[in-house]
Amino acid sequence: MPSGKTHDTITVLLAVPTAAAAFAVTGDFWLSLVVFCGFIFGGLMFGPDLDTGSSQYGRWSIFRFFWFPYRNFFKHRSRWSHGLIFGTVLRVIYFMGVVTCVAFIVAYVYTAYVGGNLPGVSDFARVWAQVRTYSDRLLGEYGLAGLFVGMWLGAASHTLTDIAGTYVKTGKAGL
């Protein structure tokens, strides 16, 4: 299995060619920049090794607690953490859920302290809709899709590097 430093180097080396490919496909500089940023984030912070005490996990610093349940629930190198199809999708859904839960807890503590009404599920849905509207305004119509594609490619480069490393060591193409 390649080291964290090897994964980081591969992420950095592939980021510019990924952005160039995104520009060749879309012809949109800003969308290519979003893909580039997603690739860097996906490779360095949001990759498959968040289920271990990896450098990706360590980079979350004081926010590592977000990933504690994920680390305990998913087996390392499983199809759910390292899978090309499910890995990034699952991490995005998990992260959005954790952020929503943390926001709910903060809102609950705040309303308990100062009084008022606790926000309901519809309030959180409205906030996520506003996040989508804001991101469309900031990143463009395809910005979130470009961000996800970049994150997926960054995480996929990690998984494919693991597969290649396993093949070199054992002669078997598997995780």
Regions found by a protein language model. Give the residues of each.
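N-terminal membrane-targeting hydrophobic helices
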Residues: 1-175
